[in-house]
Each structure stands twice: as C-alpha cells, then as structure tokens.
Amino acid sequence: MQEVMIERACALLADGTVSRVLGWKNGEFAYDPTPAVFDSAEALQKAFVYNDFCASNLSKYLIKLSRAEGKTLIFVKPCDSYSLNQLLTEHRVKRESIYVIGVPCDGKVSENKIRENGVEGVTSITTEGETVTVHTLYGDTAFQKTDIMDDRCIKIGRAHV
C-alpha cells in the first residue's frame, strides 16, 4: 500500500494538482511514525511511511495547511474521516484547499500491547494477512493482529467503500 500511496502522491505533485502532501515519516522509534509534510517527490520517496503503526490522525494538521497557497493532499483512514468531516462542517478547514484520498485500514497495532506481551526493542513490523511479525533487536515474534490491535481500532470497525 505504501508504494501505491507514494506513486499517487508523486503524480499529483508532478502535475501541479497539489503543492504538498500530508502523511507520516519514521519517528525516533520504529513504532512511532510522526505526521509530516512533504513538498517534493524526492522527499516522499525518501521518508514517507504507511504501516500498521501509522495511527496518528492527520486531519487536525489541515487547519493550518488549508490556509497555505495551493492544495494539500491528505491520506485519510476511515476513523480519521469523522474528524475531517467535522472540521469541514465547522469551516475550520477550507475544502477547496485539500485533496483527499481515502486509504484502507484494517486496524493499527498498539506498541503498548506488544510490550505487554514481553516484546522489547522493536525495530520494524511486517504484516501478512492476519499475522503481524514484530522484528526486534532480540529476534522476531509473531502475533495475530487482533491480539495487538489498538483498542480504538477494535471499536471502530469502519471501512472506506
């Protein structure tokens, strides 16, 4: 999915449809992606990430970015669409200044639940179907995704159609 998102964002930047992309980049730790603004294809290809740790809601960052010149591309997970719609309803975000792409999400992984299972030193994760493999400094551990899914994700159960 990450590659498709980067490809689409690069195309929209290249043809001038958008001026910037609001997404995620790796934080200090593998389990802590942080919201980021990208203004070039090179920056996207170098630092953009979308994985099972990308739980941050990007909608609130549009309040300021929608006032900037040009359009901002935002990738919206199903649960984030609630807050984006509310910001639009309250006129806190200019609709004409954003380009929205809905992205699928079948739940994000909780770093706290991984730790509760005795796993430390996370370096990355890979997801294959319903199995999440947590790679650490000490080896790999496999989990069923539902066992380490963020509680918020379990409750929402909403998907883009």
Task: Describe each PLM feature range.
Residues M1-H160:
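Iron-sulfur-associated redox domains of electron-transfer enzymes in respiratory
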